[in-house]
């Protein structure tokens, strides 16, 4: 699951679905700031806990630990969980810079050999967090995060991309009509195919 204000309406409707057997679902969140306390309002895990993870009876809920002492080990731990529970569905958004999860243009790699990695957040991404009222100032936005990589997201059987806000219009346009390139990481979604269909 993506954690962003753009997902609020979707998540609020999803938790009321009578057609989903939540007890069969292993839930994951796809990115987390490094250095943010897990119960801080800005924590993506906390965001999802409040909006969905604590509202329905998942089989398991798996969190990235942005406060892990050894971030490489945390990436390995979460990667092993993803391999143990292959992803059926990814629900994601698109950032103003075209990112998916925290795969900003400078760190996006369509052929990444990792499932989870540490990334440096670009200034557009960090400013978006301020504009969306997640942080008061740019300097309060962490400079680094953990994220599922693009290949990890594309392993899903189904992908749902929810982008309701006007401030994302340019990113959506570039995704749909621009070059498929790591300069607009979301553009890779145009090549996504599902074996499950």
Model feature map: region roles:
Residues 85-110:
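Glycine-rich phosphate-binding loop
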Residues 192-197:
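Conserved small/polar residues in nucleotide/adenosyl-binding loops
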Residues 2-4, 29, 64-65, 91-94, ...:
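Short beta-strand segments
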Residues 101-148:
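Class I SAM-dependent methyltransferase SAM-binding "motif I" and its flanking Rossmann-like core
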Residues 91-93, 139-174:
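Glycine-rich anion-binding loop/nest that anchors nucleotide
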Residues 1-18:
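Glycine-rich N-terminal segment of FAD-binding domains in flavoprotein oxidoreductases
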Residues 21-91:
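Ligand-binding beta-strand-loop-alpha-helix segment within the catalytic cores
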